[in-house]
Design a protein with these regions (language model features):
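A generic signature of intrinsically disordered, low-complexity regions enriched in glycine/proline
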Residues: 13-14, 93, 137, 163
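N-terminal glycine-rich flavin-associated loop
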Residues: 82-105, 131-134
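Short hydrophobic "helix-edge" motifs at membrane interfaces and signal-peptide entry regions
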Residues: 47-48, 93-94, 142-143
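Conserved short loop/turn motifs at secondary-structure junctions
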Residues: 31-35, 58-62, 94-100, 126-129
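Amphipathic, small/basic residue-rich leader segments at the start of a protein or domain
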Residues: 1-88, 105-116
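Glycine-rich, Trp-frequent "lid" loop and neighboring beta-strands that shape
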Residues: 62-63, 105-163
């Protein structure tokens, strides 16, 4: 995604994440998962660690981490609690779409706020009759004048409560 950070920086970042996971996440995973509780405090800590801007370019307030470092972060988080990596990943997938394909004004409007955690990216992929099969989705966005009209059904939208 971006220029790789030096190995020493990778090691420091990964060590911080490992400490966070062992101290704040692993001890509460079973309880929160069993009670179907959204881990807001954990998400807030991911934001404080700068991880909601992990792959966003520094010019937009992000860390600008390499794809390699990002993959290592996701691997570590997923090993402790897969659900948390889903919130984080979905957010950064949306941020990557804006960073790569957005107009300059969209980048200015959204990327700083994504990086700070003020806004969260969400993904509306899963549908009742096809799951996450992109070839089978039925939801459509059709331009109608200056707007798009979206029609379809989704089973859930990752991060929708925070978008």
């Amino acid at each position: 995604m971006n220029t790789p950070a030096p190995d020493i920086d990778d090691a420091l970042i990964l060590d911080s994440i490992d400490q966070f996971l062992e101290r704040d996440v692993r001890p509460v995973v079973r309880e929160l998962e069993a009670n179907d509780v959204y881990p807001q405090e954990i998400v807030d800590q991911l934001i404080q660690l700068g991880l909601f801007g992990a792959t966003i370019a520094p010019e937009y307030g992000g860390l600008g981490l390499s794809a390699r470092t990002y993959a290592k972060i996701i691997e570590r988080i997923s090993a402790v609690w897969m659900s948390v990596s889903g919130f984080f990943n979905s957010h950064l997938i949306m941020a990557a779409a804006v960073q790569r394909f957005g107009r300059d004004e969209q980048k200015q409007q959204f990327l700083h706020r994504f990086a700070s955690g003020e806004l969260r990216g969400g993904i509306a992929l899963t549908e009742p009759d096809c799951g996450t099969d992109l070839q089978a989705i039925r939801t459509r966005a059709v331009k109608d004048g200056e707007e798009y009209v979206v029609n379809g059904s989704k089973t859930w939208i990752t991060n929708s409560s925070a978008c």
